[in-house]
Amino acid sequence: MAKGLLFIVSAPSGTGKSSLIQALVNTHPLYSIKVSVSHTTRIIRPGECHGKHYYFISNTEFQNMIDKEEFLEYAKVFNNYYGTSKKQINYGLSTGTDVFLDIDWQGARQIRNKLPESKSIFILPPSKEELYRRLCKRGQDSDIIIKKRMNQAVSEMKHYIDYDYLIINDNFNLAVSDLYKIIRVAHLSIKHQIQRNNLLIRNLLNE
């Protein structure tokens, strides 16, 4: 069985990356896709579920996982830790499932260094004004936090150049389509096609 492909998706808070990934999973059943669930030390928000949105753990538990080298990557964001479990990623890929990682640029850099075959995607908002509007519309943060997120967004967006692909989330449906096309192209690479269709290719070339 051919291994699944690993896709890294990063974007500033409020850009819509989580909604894009979920829409991709719901509307494109051609490929088996799983969204990795990260571990975090931040407080659970209303409407979130442990094990679905994140694995919510204590600082002590997180540190124990670091000590045991159980994370593929981890980073501190807004005074909270976020990390990606090695075991979870390896299992998903081994079953032929494509795994999506919704992580920030720091985590993305760590994973690209460890797994250079991964595909990385950065998502930008159409403008700062639209990003601010989306953050306000969520109704989750105070004005002070929103201002902090906007400042952080500018810093994060400077790292788009480190990624393989860039999507502008101006038109949601078009952005979902662009995300799907990236998956399709990755599956058509020579390396992946040889893994998936090795027997077929050998039979065709057998004299």
UniProtKB/Swiss-Prot annotation:
> What EC numbers are recorded for this enzyme?
2.7.4.8
Where ATP binds, per the record, is at A11, P12, S13, G14, T15, G16, K17, S18
Keywords recorded for this protein, A-Z: ATP-binding, Cytoplasm, Kinase, Nucleotide-binding, Transferase
Q: Name one GO cellular component term.
A: cytosol
Q: Which InterPro entries match?
A: GK/Ca_channel_bsu (IPR008145), Guanylate_kin-like_dom (IPR008144), Guanylate_kinase (IPR017665), Guanylate_kinase_CS (IPR020590), P-loop_NTPase (IPR027417)
- Going by the entry's taxonomy, the superkingdom of the source organism is recorded as Bacteria
Pfam families cross-referenced by the UniProt entry: Guanylate_kin (PF00625)
Predominant location category: cytoplasm
Tell where it localizes.
Cytoplasm
| Transmembrane domains' residue ranges | none
The Guanylate kinase-like domain sits at 4-184
Among the GO molecular function terms of this UniProt record, one is: ATP binding
Family assignment? Belongs to the guanylate kinase family.
UniProt xrefs under NCBIfam families: guanyl_kin (TIGR03263)
Q: Which PANTHER family match?
A: GUANYLATE KINASE, GUANYLATE KINASE-RELATED
What's the protein called, per UniProt? Guanylate kinase
Q: What is the lineage of its organism?
A: Bacteria, Pseudomonadati, Pseudomonadota, Gammaproteobacteria, Enterobacterales
